[in-house]
Regions:
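Short acidic, Gly/Ser-rich segments with clustered Asp/Glu that frequently serve as metal-coordination loops
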Residues: 42-55
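Non-catalytic pre-domain segments flanking phosphatase-related domains
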Residues: 1-2, 35
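Structural preference for beta-strand elements that scaffold enzyme active sites
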Residues: 12-14, 41
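Conserved, mostly hydrophobic/aromatic
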Residues: 16, 34, 45, 80
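Short, glycine/acidic-enriched loop or turn micro-motifs at the edges of active sites
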Residues: 19, 46-48, 61-62
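Metal-dependent phosphodiesterase/phospholipase catalytic core, i.e.
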Residues: 4, 10-11, 58-98
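Short, acidic/polar
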Residues: 23-33
Length: 98
């Protein structure tokens, strides 16, 4: 009997919220930047908007990572799309969408 392991077919490393330290977490910029660093898998958190559309957000409220207030579940996706999810991180990402 052999105990040889089969090669692991899945990514060994997962980028947490994209490249969340280098770009605003859970944004397209964070995922693109993570991909340029060789990541093939990303961990993210999804929430539902008031009108039932999924969007990416870790926190229970909008304040830490956007210019919004309250919870995303109280807003329509159209309202969420207007939020700035980048300015909290750096000027380079000002205006970044969720």
């Amino acid at each position: 009997m052999t105990n040889a392991l089969k090669p692991w077919p899945y990514p060994r490393w997962v980028a947490h919220r994209g490249a969340g330290k280098l770009a605003p977490e859970n944004t397209l910029s964070a995922f693109r930047l993570g991909a340029t660093h060789g990541y093939r898998m990303f961990e993210c958190d999804a929430k539902l908007s008031k009108d039932g559309v999924l969007f990416l957000m870790h926190d229970a409220t909008l304040e830490r990572t956007t210019n919004g207030h309250g919870t995303g579940s109280d807003l329509s996706m159209g309202e969420i799309a207007q939020l700035d999810a980048g300015s909290w991180h750096s000027r380079a990402y000002a205006g970044e969408a969720l």
